[in-house]
Amino acid sequence: MGPTASGKTDLAIALARKLPFEIISVDSAMVYRGLDIGTAKPNEEELQLTSHRLINICDPSFPYSAGQFYKDALSEIKTIEIRNRTPLLVGGTMLYFHILEQGFSDLPTADETVRKKIQEEAAQHGWAKIHERLNAIDPKSAARINPNDAQRIQRAFEVYETTGQPLSSYQSLKRFKALPYQFINLILAPENRSWLHQRIEKRFDQMLKNNFLEEVRQLYNRGDLNSDLPAIRTVGYRQVWKYLSGEYDYETMRHKAIAATRQLAKRQLTWLRRWPDAKWFNSEDKDLISQVVDYLKGIGM
């Protein structure tokens, strides 16, 4: 586990080449075919050398859910077990990790810092404006909430700001139980936040050089996709989509995509700091791979 751009995929591939692991992607965007550059998906050569399960399994028009992931991941884990190998779950969609390991029963607890921030914004702009913003990130919840219902708007927005997942995605998870497996939680993150921020900016600029705009343009030109679909709401894709529709100019698109990616990383780190029984590794360490391999061998892997 780790924030976006922390080096999870490279580490996972290295581990799978050294140990009897098979990788399962835990990423709500990599499931979609055609979302390659903007998700930093492993390339064809990497996928041939080390297979990744739950990558490229559905069309962007399909609203893939946490519930569907739970079922798919369980099936893949069982398949890997039959092969007498160990599943290596890799990604940054914290809700997916959460329902596998801890199950799901209640909504996330309130975060007073986030709540205060939302209240200050509402005092300045009004709850109707906050409702408009909610509609952009969680249209299902926004459709059920009156624009003047401050309490429900605040809670829905708070859940998203804290977890990076819309409230509506939680409301379909009450039936899921934690899987009956022992999880070894490894968290990869840099100690220096500025390192991650710089890496996020450099990575997005490299995506643009690698024809990310053309990738999104192909999706845009299909005609059957829209900005409310989970695939298109993915960080980076959402901003380029607005650029293609004329809502943003190029520099605004770039700035907002980088800022949104940094906010995503912040939300992911909020989840991770609360994660029980986790071993942290520093993304910046040059001997990272050997550190992780030694740790895993030391606990009997």
Swiss-Prot record:
<feature type="region of interest" description="Interaction with substrate tRNA">
    <location>
        <begin position="151"/>
        <end position="155"/>
    </location>
</feature>
<dbReference type="GO" id="GO:0006400">
    <property type="term" value="P:tRNA modification"/>
</dbReference>
<dbReference type="Pfam" id="PF01715">
    <property type="entry name" value="IPPT"/>
</dbReference>
<feature type="binding site">
    <location>
        <begin position="2"/>
        <end position="9"/>
    </location>
    <ligand>
        <name>ATP</name>
    </ligand>
</feature>
<comment type="function">
    <text>Catalyzes the transfer of a dimethylallyl group onto the adenine at position 37 in tRNAs that read codons beginning with uridine, leading to the formation of N6-(dimethylallyl)adenosine (i(6)A).</text>
</comment>
<keyword id="KW-0808">Transferase</keyword>
<keyword id="KW-0547">Nucleotide-binding</keyword>
<keyword id="KW-0067">ATP-binding</keyword>
<feature type="site" description="Interaction with substrate tRNA">
    <location>
        <position position="93"/>
    </location>
</feature>
<keyword id="KW-0819">tRNA processing</keyword>
<dbReference type="InterPro" id="IPR027417">
    <property type="entry name" value="P-loop_NTPase"/>
</dbReference>
<dbReference type="InterPro" id="IPR039657">
    <property type="entry name" value="Dimethylallyltransferase"/>
</dbReference>
<protein>
    <recommendedName>
        <fullName>tRNA dimethylallyltransferase</fullName>
        <ecNumber>2.5.1.75</ecNumber>
    </recommendedName>
</protein>
<comment type="similarity">
    <text>Belongs to the IPP transferase family.</text>
</comment>
<dbReference type="InterPro" id="IPR018022">
    <property type="entry name" value="IPT"/>
</dbReference>
<dbReference type="GO" id="GO:0052381">
    <property type="term" value="F:tRNA dimethylallyltransferase activity"/>
</dbReference>
<feature type="site" description="Interaction with substrate tRNA">
    <location>
        <position position="115"/>
    </location>
</feature>
<comment type="subunit">
    <text>Monomer.</text>
</comment>
<feature type="binding site">
    <location>
        <begin position="4"/>
        <end position="9"/>
    </location>
    <ligand>
        <name>substrate</name>
    </ligand>
</feature>
<dbReference type="GO" id="GO:0005524">
    <property type="term" value="F:ATP binding"/>
</dbReference>
<feature type="region of interest" description="Interaction with substrate tRNA">
    <location>
        <begin position="27"/>
        <end position="30"/>
    </location>
</feature>
<keyword id="KW-0460">Magnesium</keyword>
